[in-house]
A protein has these predicted regions:
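Active-site "substrate specificity/gating" loop of NAD(P)-dependent dehydrogenases
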Residues: 16, 20, 44
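C-terminal substrate-binding subdomain of Rossmann-fold SDR/epimerase-dehydratase oxidoreductases
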Residues: 32-143
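Short beta-loop-alpha junction of Rossmann-like oxidoreductase domains
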Residues: 13-16, 122
Length: 143
């Protein structure tokens, strides 16, 4: 039996351990606290991510280990993408800072995906519908 999982934009505690590879949520919170403002790329309102809480992923993995027999590949995400700008605005409002727009780096333009969203049909068919922590709830918890 082989089970594979595609994780979509994982967030949660310990993101600082990823260094430069930390996600935007962590980076924006750090910018707000250290710089007093948040930098987002131009057109951030058109960049969407399916943010997935690491705690939900851990629970899903435990459920798979105890209930799912069989092989497959499953997408793991909330299925609800949110724009970079919406997330940055939520953090900026909490931290009481402004958002500054910067150009997207040239090295990102050709390889950057503007939208990610997990197709959860196979996951739901295998293990049923799940309640995922909404990214805005996490942002509120981490304030």
């Amino acid at each position: 039996m082989v089970q594979g999982f595609r994780y979509f934009n994982v967030y949660g505690k310990w993101m600082h351990l990823r260094g430069n590879r930390a996600n935007a949520i962590y980076k924006w919170r750090e910018q707000a606290r250290k710089q007093g403002y948040i930098e987002v790329w131009e057109n951030a309102e058109h960049i969407f991510r399916d943010w997935t809480y690491v705690g939900d992923i851990c629970q899903l993995q435990l459920d798979f280990m105890t209930t799912v027999v069989g092989s497959g590949i499953w997408n793991v995400g909330s299925g609800l993408p949110h724009s970079f700008l919406d997330i940055a605005e939520a953090i900026a409002e909490q931290e009481g800072v402004e958002i500054r727009t910067i150009p997207m780096p040239e090295n990102e333009k050709s390889r950057f995906r503007h939208k990610t969203c997990a197709d959860l049909k196979h996951l739901k068919a295998t293990i049923g519908k799940r309640k995922w922590l909404n990214v805005y709830e996490w942002i509120d918890l981490e304030a």
